[in-house]
């Protein structure tokens, strides 16, 4: 189901099967229900970095009918506080630390900042649940707050083997909140429902991205954005594919890292943004040719892609074999609105739609 790739290359890749995912989601759901006291209709803010624990937590909350609101891991404690206050969350779920550019960053400090700022604005956080980057070891310098902060890995021991019946939801019941980036003012919370969103994320994953159960699919986006929700978690997993989650930056420790990951995991569907494509082209224009991978399909998303960048993406990254789908959509839509269809629509460099 999930291949979690740590940023440090010497650390092992965590291969999580669908059975293992089912077990871990159920155990986390039991903890969230019985320890955190969460129930259907509650809102919970997540401030997690790219990790296997992020989709596990999202799916556990969804199993309980609890509305999740994930904040991009790179955002500040204040940004998390704004979303805690707006959503009325009384539980925050985070991680102690994560790697970025080879450095282990203290992420726990942001939860303290978020809780303090939220309290100033009238929203008290009752519990902060903290996943450990290394199970059994606390990796942050920021101390825990007694009575409020709890280590998920420790508490999970009380729920091993637990099974939780999923909450039956109506199609229009909320599944999650996704806040816009706030580039045009205060971040706005977009609420996505259960039935329509899942149907659309699944349908576009299948027909636009050509995802099948045997595929290994890698979207380089962050789950903190709508692209990650729809096309790392909900879409690929609903189609029984294998979804790659990478912890760090694509050029660590060198520009060949993405293509080594693709080679080692047999990735055959690749999904990224023009900004990343431009960066990879600049720092390692000849790197893809050094690695033995084969993409059948490549997506570009998030912004227009210049024709010359598109051509490098097709010729060098795709090795003139992969179909490119250029897409346009919004946080509010939950899935692709404008795109070509692989193998059906002609491709045109820089065009997100019919050529």
Q: Language-model features: where?
A:
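Conserved pre-ATP/AMP-binding loop-to-beta segment of ANL
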Residues: 125-136, 143-179, 186, 196, ...
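ATP-dependent adenylate-forming carboxylate-activation enzymes
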Residues: 48-49, 69-85, 97-100, 106, ...
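Conserved AMP-binding/adenylation subdomain of ANL enzymes
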Residues: 65, 198-216, 226-269, 282-285
């Amino acid at each position: 189901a999930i291949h979690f790739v740590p940023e440090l290359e010497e650390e092992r890749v965590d291969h999580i099967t669908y059975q293992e995912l089912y077990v871990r989601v159920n155990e986390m759901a039991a903890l969230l229900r019985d320890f955190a006291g969460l129930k259907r209709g509650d809102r919970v803010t997540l401030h997690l970095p790219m990790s296997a624990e992020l989709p596990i937590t999202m799916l556990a909350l969804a199993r309980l009918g609890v509305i999740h609101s994930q904040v991009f891991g790179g955002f500040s404690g204040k940004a998390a506080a704004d979303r805690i206050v707006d959503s009325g969350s009384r539980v925050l779920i985070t991680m102690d630390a994560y790697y970025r550019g080879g450095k282990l960053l203290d992420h726990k400090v942001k939860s303290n900042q978020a809780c303090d700022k939220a309290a100033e604005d009238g929203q008290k956080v009752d519990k902060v649940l903290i996943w450990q980057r290394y199970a059994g070891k606390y990796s942050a310098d920021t101390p825990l707050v007694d009575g409020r902060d709890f280590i998920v890995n420790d508490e999970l021991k009380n729920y091993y083997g637990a099974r939780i019946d999923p909450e039956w939801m109506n199609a229009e019941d909320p599944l999650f909140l996704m806040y816009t980036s706030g580039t045009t003012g205060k971040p706005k919370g977009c609420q996505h429902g259960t039935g329509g969103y899942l149907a659309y994320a699944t349908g576009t994953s299948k027909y636009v991205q050509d995802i099948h159960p045997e595929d290994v699919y890698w979207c380089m986006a962050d789950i903190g954005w709508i692209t990650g929700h729809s096309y790392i978690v909900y879409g690929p997993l609903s189609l029984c594919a294998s979804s790659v989650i990478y912890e760090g930056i694509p050029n660590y420790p060198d520009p060949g890292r993405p293509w080594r990951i693709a080679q080692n995991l047999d990735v055959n569907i690749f999904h990224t943004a023009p900004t990343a494509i431009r960066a990879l082209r600049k720092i390692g224009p000849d790197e893809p040719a050094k690695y033995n991978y084969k993409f059948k399909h490549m997506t570009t998303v998030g912004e227009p892609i210049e024709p010359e960048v598109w051509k490098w993406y097709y010729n060098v990254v795709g090795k003139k074999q992969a179909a490119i789908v250029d897409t346009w959509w919004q946080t509010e839509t939950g899935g692709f609105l404008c795109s070509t269809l692989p193998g059906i629509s002609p491709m045109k460099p820089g065009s997100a739609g019919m050529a």
